[in-house]
Amino acid sequence: MKQNQFVSSSARKARKAPFNAPSHIRRKLMSAPSTKDLRNKHGIRSIPIRIDDEVTVTRG
């Protein structure tokens, strides 16, 4: 049984949702955790990524 009626259980709709999301929500979805030295320096755990940012893919 579905817990939340506003979230689709269809796989293709779930995959499409971040691409069709508004920019202020997509910004939160497309974020990456910062390294430990940057985390200590700036006090920010994760940062929204932009074009030309370098990220390390750890899974997926």
Curated annotation (Swiss-Prot):
**Molecular-function GO term, any one:** structural constituent of ribosome
- Annotated region Disordered: the residues are 1-43
Keywords assigned: Ribonucleoprotein, Ribosomal protein
The UniProt entry's GO CC annotations, sorted and at most eight, read: large ribosomal subunit
Q: Where is the composition biased (Polar residues)?
A: 1-11
- One Pfam family name is Ribosomal_L26
The record's InterPro entries line, in alphabetical order, gives: Rib_uL2_dom2, Ribosomal_uL24_euk/arc, Translation_prot_SH3-like_sf
Similarity field: Belongs to the universal ribosomal protein uL24 family.
Q: What is the protein's given name?
A: Large ribosomal subunit protein uL24
Q: Which GO terms describe its biological process?
A: translation
Q: Taxonomically, which superkingdom?
A: Eukaryota
Kindly list the organism's lineage.
Eukaryota, Metazoa, Ecdysozoa, Nematoda, Chromadorea
* Disulphide connectivity of cysteines: none
